[in-house]
Curated annotation (Swiss-Prot):
Single Gene Ontology MF annotation: metal ion binding
Keywords assigned by UniProt, alphabetized: Lyase, Metal-binding
SUPFAM superfamilies: RraA-like (SSF89562)
Assembly mode: Homotrimer.
Free-text remark on how the cofactor is bound: Divalent metal cation.
Native organism taxonomy: Bacteria, Pseudomonadati, Pseudomonadota, Betaproteobacteria, Burkholderiales
Species of the source: Burkholderia multivorans (strain ATCC 17616 / 249)
Record: residues binding a divalent metal cation: 103
Name of the protein described by the UniProt record: Putative 4-hydroxy-4-methyl-2-oxoglutarate aldolase
EC nos: 4.1.3.17, 4.1.1.112
Any Pfam family the entry gives: RraA-like
Signal peptide residue numbers: none
Cofactor(s) listed in the protein's UniProt record: a divalent metal cation
Domain of life: Bacteria
Catalytic activity entry: 4-hydroxy-4-methyl-2-oxoglutarate = 2 pyruvate; oxaloacetate + H(+) = pyruvate + CO2
Amino acid sequence: MTFATTDLCDAHEDKLAAGTLRVLQPALRPYGGAARFAGPAATLKVFEDNTLVRAALEQDGGGRVLVVDGGASLRCALVGGNLGALAEKNGWAGIVVHGCVRDAAELRECKVGVLALATHPRKSDKRGAGERDVPVTVLGTRIAPGEWIYADDDGVLVSATSLT
């Protein structure tokens, strides 16, 4: 899929004004091997527990983007190299983590986009806590399941509908 978030913003100023196209605050850093990715959002709300993240990535991604609202925790990682490889194997376009990742060198080798706040060497808990397919909030922006995510070097967009 070829697009530029800058061009999408320019072409859809009406959607930006209406709030059906939103721009995430520029605080996420790239860690995956794909610099540009897009797809409908699958959402998770978790806190310092990545059990649901693994369960989601074990499923066929079908070109979707997994959006993980990790509560902006900087105390452990929710995604690492093994989950990045799993996402690539199962056809996920990308992963957006409102929290941390680890195994940064391994994530760079995966042909999937990965964005997160930071890296952290500690793994998460495995309690199975969290919610799936619910509206989440990432950097103050609400993202509902099925909304479209567009990410590249210039930023991340959330759209109520497909723009390409």
